[in-house]
Amino acid sequence: DEEYLMESNEEAFRLDVKTDIESVEKQALWAGIKPGMRVADIGCGSGKTTAILHNLVQPGGVVVGVDGSEKRIIYAQDHYAAQGIKFICKDIREPLGDLGLFDLVWVRFLLEYYLSNSSDIVENISEIVKPGGILCLIDLDHNCLNYCGLPPKLERTIFAAMRVLGEKANFDPYAGRRLYSYLYKLGYQDIDVNVSAHHLIFGRLRDSDAFNWMKKIEVVSRKVNYQFEEYKGGYEEFLNEFMRFFTDPGRFVYT
């Protein structure tokens, strides 16, 4: 049974740090969230997004956060428990019918970790959307692959590493472009699409971006045991060059 790519003792904290309240609210309102709704947050992680969605369905709404990690469900319960919020540990690849039906099912930054089976996962999740309800899929496209000012050796290494992630860790850096087709093939009506930048990094590096990207590089490099062949000093030399680029206020990065 494959392990979640970003699994680490600090993953719940990383998810908390990187989750921007304003962005989640804007996306949820665009998707059609309203007071009184029953909402499922699939792949809820730390529970921060679940709490944001809960605020948007008040008065009278409830949100169920679902995640496959018992550790993150405990973290979510410790940090975001409230009346009208329930957290459940469950494998989202297995049947979800016992959760009941929902007015809105929210799936954000989850499918990128399931390159080979994301279509099946969406079909499974779709079973808990009530007739006339909303299934909102949000994910990144060309993930961690858009840079200006990247030294050639660093660029080759990053692109090669992303290919290895697809081969060894079921990771999909192009998940975003596939979302429309999933909904279309399942027969959804009134499908709408919105495309915007998620990572948008220029000028002074924010502490939250520095922590998030450092943690991603650290965890992913260890998980897939990637060999930094162009760097005689291996991972440490690669990391030093990446951080010189990433902390330079003249660089530009977006996803």
What are these regions (language model features)?
Residues 136-205:
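Conserved catalytic/acceptor-binding region of the Class I
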Residues 40, 46-95, 120:
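Class I SAM-dependent methyltransferase SAM/SAH-binding core
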Residues 2-22:
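Class I SAM-dependent methyltransferase Rossmann-like catalytic core
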Residues 18-37, 52:
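Conserved alpha-helix/loop element of class I SAM-dependent methyltransferases that forms part
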Residues 58, 114-115, 129-131:
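Helix-to-beta-strand junctions that scaffold the AdoMet/dcAdoMet cofactor pocket
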Residues 192-255:
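Conserved Class I S-adenosyl-L-methionine
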Residues 119-134:
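A short glycine-rich, Lys/Arg-flanked "PGG" loop and its adjoining helix->strand segment in the class I
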Residues 96-105:
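A short acidic, Gly/Pro-enriched loop at the edge of an enzyme's catalytic core
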